[in-house]
């Protein structure tokens, strides 16, 4: 019986879920807006809210705790140095979920999860590996 179980399994093992949400947290902090399925967005929201609260409290131990959760030192730095000061006067509710229709292939409910008062210039920046091109040609 699954009485009292709060979180969704999302048809993944525990390790897969933990890794997936770590990657999604890093992507959300990096781009400040991501598109995913609605159940994943609903599961991601409390994780990100707790990370922002850690960032607001500050301190080395909490920074290490955030690194252990997210596994991306650069995004933890952004979390503590950029996002935490931005939300210092807000008590929770740092993210919003906007329903975004249904995916074409499998009709899965899609959603946009984004930070409230987000930086619109952060979306899509550095979204993949950069290939160096020589301009000397």
Swiss-Prot record:
It comes from the Bacteria. InterPro entries: Ribosomal_bL17, Ribosomal_bL17_CS, Ribosomal_bL17_sf. Keywords: Ribonucleoprotein, Ribosomal protein. It holds the Pfam family Ribosomal_L17. One of its GO terms (cellular component) is cytosolic large ribosomal subunit. PROSITE patterns: RIBOSOMAL_L17. HAMAP family: Ribosomal_bL17. This is Large ribosomal subunit protein bL17. Belongs to the bacterial ribosomal protein bL17 family. Part of the 50S ribosomal subunit. Contacts protein L32. It comes from Bradyrhizobium sp. (strain ORS 278). One of its GO terms (biological process) is translation. Coiled coil: none annotated. GO terms for molecular function: structural constituent of ribosome.
